[in-house]
Amino acid sequence: MKKHNFSAGPAILPDEVIQAASIAVQELDNIGLSLIEISHRSAEFKDIMEEACALSLKLLGLEGKGYKAIFLQGGASMQFLMTAYNLLENKAGYINSGTWSTKAIKEAKLFGEVLELASSKDQNFNYIPKGYDIPNDLDYLHITTNNTIFGTQYQSIPETDVPLVADMSSDIFSRPFDYSKFDMFYAGAQKNMGPSGVTLVVIK
């Protein structure tokens, strides 16, 4: 009997996914090569990536809505850096709701001014901050939608006129959700999608 894993990760995969992957590792689509033997620049691998990106957008309800999905290395923690590196020109706002948002704030400060608009640190992150002002001149607002360590989750997403960015590593694909509220979001694969080592990034 297959074990269940109720921790934050790694994700338990459906049997049909394991079976399809094991077949592809032996030989991919009758091409005479294993999935792990083909070039990452080959047409076969390009097709795999394009299908994965397209299916991700479809599952997220973002197909045909002006979003692009990409898979990157480095885990979600790398996105703490890359988000600020690419988007932070003047100043950004962050909501501090736990361990991962604390780390995101620390990394973003390497690239510019970071405003911690609200925090639940005063009560050991046991609630999601509410009732804060969001300046209109921010480059973006960053939130972490779910906090596995402290057991808190956004039930409503902040309404804002500035671009909204989210770390959704631990609750992406977990519930019906209007992902179009976000201008960019990212998630490490190992919690809800598959093996560790890759991050899904979706950007408008």
Briefly describe each language-model feature range.
Residues 31-82, 99, 107:
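Conserved N-terminal alpha-helix of the aminotransferase class I/II PLP-enzyme fold
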Residues 1-39:
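N-terminal "arm"/small-domain region of PLP-dependent enzymes with the aminotransferase-like
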Residues 9, 108, 120-172, 184:
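Active-site phosphate-binding strand-loop segment of PLP-dependent enzymes
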Residues 5-7, 69-73, 94, 116-118, ...:
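General beta-strand structural signal in soluble alpha/beta enzymes
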Residues 76-141:
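PLP-dependent aminotransferase-like
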